[in-house]
Amino acid sequence: MNKSKFLVYSSLVVFAIALGLFVYLVNASKALSYLSSDPKACINCHVMNPQYATWQHSSHAERASCVECHLPTGNMVQKYISKARDGWNHSVAFTLGTYDHSMKISEDGARRVQENCISCHASLSSTLLENADRNHQFNDPKGASERLCWECHKSVPHGKVRSLTATPDNLGVREVK
């Protein structure tokens, strides 16, 4: 076999192996699931089981998915930029073992969730607007003295996450259809 044919065949073999590894990693990591809005993508990592289980048993389970609360709404570009940035940060943290096992929301994540709480509840509930008090000033961009919704509404939607971390199988979260 001459040298040029050997290089072509060798290159094809290396490319095929690299492609096979790439396909395997995409499949093993369930990478395509992260492009969806399916809340089950959030439990690809066992660390999120308590958050998924508490959301699943909350009033929000029938009305809002994880991405509707945790990612920007309205602008698809911003949504996927945030999703990619968060995914990259999570991947690096889990790969290097530098993540906080108690899973605390980031400052940017808290801002997005707060904006989505206000957006969803301000548009859905005229009662809250009519009876607005100092804690529910939805029309004020700073809100009620910059309080976060979950400071008062502690059980929405994740409830007592810490108590679920010790629950065997986290309420059967893996069997959810």
UniProtKB/Swiss-Prot annotation:
Disulfide bonds: none annotated. Residues 1-5 are cytoplasmic. The chain crosses the membrane at residues 6-26. Heme 4 binds at residues 149, 152-153. Its main location: membrane. Pfam families: Cytochrom_NNT. One of its GO terms (biological process) is anaerobic respiration. GO terms for molecular function: electron transfer activity; heme binding; metal ion binding. Binds 4 heme groups per subunit. Heme 3 binds at residues 117, 120-121. GO terms for cellular component: membrane; plasma membrane. Heme 2 binds at residues 66, 69-70, 158. It is a single-pass membrane protein. The keyword Transmembrane helix applies. Heme 1 binds at residues 42, 45, 48, 86. It comes from the Bacteria. Substrate binds at residues 79, 86. It is found in: Cell inner membrane. PROSITE patterns: MULTIHEME_CYTC (PS51008). Keywords: Cell inner membrane, Cell membrane, Electron transport, Heme, Iron, Membrane, Metal-binding, Transmembrane, Transmembrane helix, Transport. InterPro entries: Cytochrome_c-type_ET, Multihaem_cyt_sf, NapC/NirT/NrfH, NapC/NirT_cyt_c_N, NapC/NirT_cytc_sf, NrfH. The keyword GTP-binding does not apply. Subunit of the nitrite reductase complex that mediates electron transfer from quinol to the catalytic subunit. Belongs to the NapC/NirT/NrfH family. Heterodimer with NrfA. This is Cytochrome c-type protein NrfH. The lineage of its organism: Bacteria, Pseudomonadati, Campylobacterota, Epsilonproteobacteria, Campylobacterales.
